[in-house]
C-alpha cells in the first residue's frame, strides 16, 4: 500500500510539472544558461539593454547606488512589456564632481571610455546587434552621447543607442524652493518604491540641499566646477517631502518611456544600414559622390 501511495504521489507531481509548461526565459544576462542566452538573443531580436548607474553620495539619506538601483528597477519592469536582454550591473560612469564625498567611485575619463567600449564590443560579439544604453545618472548626460558619437571612429557590427530622461512627474510647486536634481523629492520618492528599506527619511533634513549659487556665469558658459559650486553637499532638493505615491507615478512614466525606446530600437533598421554605408565611405572620402 505504501509503495502504491508513493507511486501515485510521484505521478501526481510529474503531472503538475508537465502542466506548468516551459520555464519563463529570464531577461537578465547573468541568470541565463549558455543555451538560454542564444534563445534570449533571438527573442530580443538582438536588442540588449545596458542600464548605467554610478556609486556616489545621495544626500544624507539615500544609498550610494541609488542611480543603479532605480534604473535597473525600471529596465527590469520594462522588459516584461517588451523583451530585451539586460546586461549585469554597470556603474563605471562619470562622477568626477563627487570625488570629495565618501563612497564615490570615480574612474578616469580614459578608463570610462575604454571600459564602455570593451563592454559594448563584447555585447556585440555575443549577438547584441542593437545596444541600448539606459542612463540612470545625470552626470552621464554628456559622456554617453559622446560615447555614441565616437562609434563612428571605427567600424562596429552593432549600433549603440542612448536613452536618458523621461517626462518626470513633479507635484505643483515642487521646485519653488530651488532645483530638485539630486536625492531630492523626486529621486527619494522613487526609492520609497524601489528600495524603501534603504531609504532613511528621518535623515533627509540632516544636510542642506539648497543651491549655494557660489559661481555666477551666463547659462551658455560651462565650467567643470559648476555642480560643486552650487551643491557642495552633493544634495539638490529636499528629500523629506517625498512620497511613495509620487514615486509610483514617476517610475511608471519612466518605465513607459523605456518600453517605447526598446520598441523603437527594435523597429529601427536604418541606423545599421546608414552606419555601414558611412564606414565604407569614410574609408574612401575622395570617392564620395554628391
Where are these regions (language model features)?
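N-terminal secretory signal peptides that target proteins for export/translocation
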Residues: 1-2
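Extended, histidine- and acidic-residue-enriched regions that form the cofactor-binding/catalytic faces
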Residues: 20-110, 114-132, 138-290
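Bacterial N-terminal signal peptides
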Residues: 5-16
